[in-house]
Amino acid sequence: MDFQLQAIDKHARAGLLNLAHSQVATPVFMPVGTQGCIKSLDAMDMQEILGAKLILANTYHMYLRPGEKVVEQLGGLHRFAQFHGSFLTDSGGFQAFSLSGNVKLQEDGIVFKSHIDGSKHFFTPAKVLDIQYSLNSDIMMVLDDLVGLPAPLKRLEESIKRSAKWANLSLEYHKEKNRPNNNLFAIIQGGTHLKMRSLSVELTHKGFDGYAIGGLAVGESVDEMLETIAHTAPLLPKDKPRYLMGVGTPENILDAISLGVDMFDCVMPTRNARNATLFTHSGKISIKNAPYKLDNTPIEENCACYACKRYSKAYLHHLFRAKELTYARLASLHNLHFYLEMVKNARNAILEKRFLSFKKEFLEKYHSCSH
C-alpha cells in the first residue's frame, strides 16, 4: 500500500491511498456494507451512481454467513459482490461483543456464540486475519479488546495492553504471510483517558500500514471524543493513514478532519435514510412529515444525486408511507451522495488551503434549519 500526503492545512490532511483495487482520495467516507453490500444498494449503485472507491464489510457477519471459505471459493469479496473498488473489513470483535450476548474474553482471543444459531466460535488475532485473507480484503483490521464508556481505569489499561499485544502478534503473523495486497491497520484504544491513549500508541508497533482510533462514539460526550482525537492523532505516524472508526455525524467528521483524521465509516447516512431522515446542506429533514405530501421539489435544490435529479419530496414521502422498498434505495443514494460530496469538498478545500473557512460556512448553513 502506498499513501501519499498531498496537502496539509493546519492539521487537516489531503492524500492519496493506493490499494490493489482502487486509488482512494482522502479524506474518505466509507459506506458500510455489513453483509457485503450497502443495505438496499448494489455494486452498480456504489460504482456508477455514487462513485465510491472504498466500502466497509463486516468480518463477523461474512464469517458466520455465508462463510469466508465460500467467499474465497467464489473469487473473494470483490468478485462475489461485483464491486470493483476496494474493501476494508473490520476484525469482527465489536459484533462479537455487541451481538452475541455471551462473550468470554481470554488472553489469546474471544469466545462468542453466533447470534444466528448459537454455535460457539473462537476469534484469535491470527484467526481474524485468516478470515480476512479469504475475503481478500484490501484493508484488514486487527482484533482488539473493546471497552464501553465510561469504564474504570484498570479496565482501560487491561484493554490497551491486550489490544496492543494482539495487534503486534497480528503484525508478526501478517509479515510471515507475505501478502502485500492485504494491508493491516492497528487500532488504538484507551477510552477518553489521554494517558491511556498515549500508552496505547507507545505499546503498538510502528510497522502497520495504517492506524485506527477505536473505542469512541460508545457513550462519551462529543467534547470528550474530540479532545481524545486531538490528543491521539498527532501521536500517530504522519506518513500513514488515520482512521476514526464508526463516526459519525457531518459535524463529527468535519471536526475530525480538522484534527488530522483521513478515513471514516458510519451507518448513519443509510440507517437514517431508511428511517425517513434525509440530509441537506440546510440540515436534516424528516420526509414522513405531512408538509411533504404535496411538495413537488427535490430533496435539495441543486443536488446532483440520482434521487434529486428525478424525484420529488412528495414521491419519496409517498414511498415511505407506502413502505415501498424503492424508498430505501432512493433515500440511501441521496444521503450517501451528501456524505461523499461533503468529504470530497472538504478535500478540495484542504488542497486550496481554505478548510477552516469551508467548515465554518458548511456548519453555519447546516445548522440554519432542520425540518
Swiss-Prot record:
Signal peptide from the UniProt entry: none
Root EC class: transferase
Pathway(s) served: tRNA modification; tRNA-queuosine biosynthesis
Gene Ontology cellular-component annotations: cytosol
Cofactor note as given: Binds 1 zinc ion per subunit.
Binding site for Zn(2+): C303, C305, C308, H334
InterPro entries: TGT, TGT-like_sf, tRNA_ribo_trans-like
Active site: D90, D265
Cofactor(s) required for function per UniProt: Zn(2+)
Record keywords: Glycosyltransferase, Metal-binding, Queuosine biosynthesis, Transferase, tRNA processing, Zinc
UniProt EC number: 2.4.2.29
Keyword Coiled coil attached: no
Function of the molecule: Catalyzes the base-exchange of a guanine (G) residue with the queuine precursor 7-aminomethyl-7-deazaguanine (PreQ1) at position 34 (anticodon wobble position) in tRNAs with GU(N) anticodons (tRNA-Asp, -Asn, -His and -Tyr). Catalysis occurs through a double-displacement mechanism. The nucleophile active site attacks the C1' of nucleotide 34 to detach the guanine base from the RNA, forming a covalent enzyme-RNA intermediate. The proton acceptor active site deprotonates the incoming PreQ1, allowing a nucleophilic attack on the C1' of the ribose to form the product.
Quaternary structure annotation from Swiss-Prot or TrEMBL: Homodimer. Within each dimer, one monomer is responsible for RNA recognition and catalysis, while the other monomer binds to the replacement base PreQ1.
Protein name: Queuine tRNA-ribosyltransferase
Gene: tgt
